[in-house]
Amino acid sequence: KEKVYWFIRNNSRNAFKDQRILLKNLESGIILDVGAHIGNTVKLYRNYFPGYKIFCIEPFSESCDYLKKRFINASNINIVEIALGSKDETKTLFVSNFSNLNSLQRPNERAWGFADKKSVDVKTTTLDQFCYDNDIKHIDILKLDVQGSELDVLMGSKKIFEKGNISLV
């Protein structure tokens, strides 16, 4: 624990390089980008971890369509149109004027940019169930950017965390 803190405090200049070093430069593995949006982070992960299988998890269909076009020739990238949460259910996704602010949490309409323009129902599942369905035994990197629903995702990840099968969050 102290070594990781020392490493981050003294060497962190590029989060992707740091993750590569912390994973001991393994040539293959699994990355889950939960809240992939339009794939900007996926593109960076693809550059730094070319041998890894990357799952883009995104509930907004328009973003998924864009991701499919953007990574059409990337055989190591899987786009999955679903939201992760604490249980399997249907939830409301509040769609903002700015798609990077879409959220399962009701927006504060007085906050800048957070007024929703529409809402859509989306299917949610747990990270544990997602891993089971996709035969994922270990996650090397779990990236979460889900606009306030991070705790819900973690609540649905109890089994994989209890087994110690996630390297980096």
Over which residues does each language-model region extend?
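Phosphate/nucleotide-binding beta-alpha loop and adjacent structural elements of enzyme active sites
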Residues: 1-168
